[in-house]
Amino acid sequence: MPQTDKQICIPPELPELLKQFTKAAIRSQPQDLIQWAAEYFGAMSRGEIPPVRERSERVALSNWAELTPELLKILHSRVGGRLIVQADELAQMWKVLNLPTDLFNSVMNVGRFTEEIEWLKFLALACSSLGVTIAKTLKIVCEVLSSDHDSGPPRIPFSTFQFLYTYIAEVDGEISASHVSRMLNYIEQEVIGPDGLIKVNDFTQNPRVRLE
């Protein structure tokens, strides 16, 4: 095979382009991610505005139930505490709740899930379709994961929050790993009590906690 000295040049703006693409995909939640990606980058190459739709602009079909934290809580209870769930089983649970198929497919595509799905990652991305910011997304996740038997504000183990915040920030792509680390260190050292739990108010009403 003939060799060539030609090198592939990666433009310095590529990482930022991919970050914006990922965020746009989460907001738009296309049913066919490949087709949508082709339209997205095609528009950018022509200097046009990419086909990004905000959640409020998506057409709600009357035969589908609207995704809500309450329905996600039901879905979480049916997962039954498992960390890994099979894609076909989760798809069936989703269908039974009459939730939009395009949203399920979008979460699968954005999360790059295959046959075995990490449930907390799937849940985080599903909640991101409801939350405008990372803080609001984590608030919804916390409410979904919090046990109904607990009195007081919703709360989850700090280790779970740490995993979710790190993952959501990574998918978002606009928050540095160093910022995430600083916030987590502050919360762990200054906020978390002996029970090892974090409450919603700990990261939504504390002026020193800025997740974004």
Swiss-Prot record:
Modified positions (Phosphoserine) in chain numbering: 56
Ranges of residues in domain RIIa: 12-43
Keywords: Cell projection, Cilium, Flagellum, Phosphoprotein, Ubl conjugation
Region (Interaction with RHPN1): 209-212
Annotated compartments: Cell projection, Cilium, Flagellum
Biological processes per GO annotation: cilium organization; flagellated sperm motility; protein localization to cilium; regulation of protein phosphorylation; sperm capacitation
Superkingdom of the organism of origin: Eukaryota
GO cellular component terms, semicolon-separated: cytoplasm; motile cilium
Post-translational modification comment from the UniProt entry: Sumoylated, sumoylation decreases upon spermatozoa capacitation conditions.
Signal peptide stretch: none
Main subcellular location of this protein, as a coarse class: other
Alphabetized PANTHER family for the sequence: ROPPORIN-1-LIKE PROTEIN (PTHR14952), ROPPORIN-1B (PTHR14952:SF12)
Described purpose of this protein according to its UniProt entry: Important for male fertility. With ROPN1L, involved in fibrous sheath integrity and sperm motility, plays a role in PKA-dependent signaling processes required for spermatozoa capacitation.
Domain notes from UniProt: The RIIa domain mediates interaction with AKAP3.
UniProt record similarity statement: Belongs to the ropporin family.
Subunit structure: Homodimer. Interacts with AKAP3. May interact with SPA17. Interacts with RHPN1. Interacts with FSCB; the interaction increases upon spermatozoa capacitation conditions. Interacts with CFAP61.
Extra remark beyond the main annotation: 'Ropporin' comes from the Japanese word 'oppo' which means 'tail'.
Protein name stated in the entry: Ropporin-1
Gene name linked to the record: ROPN1
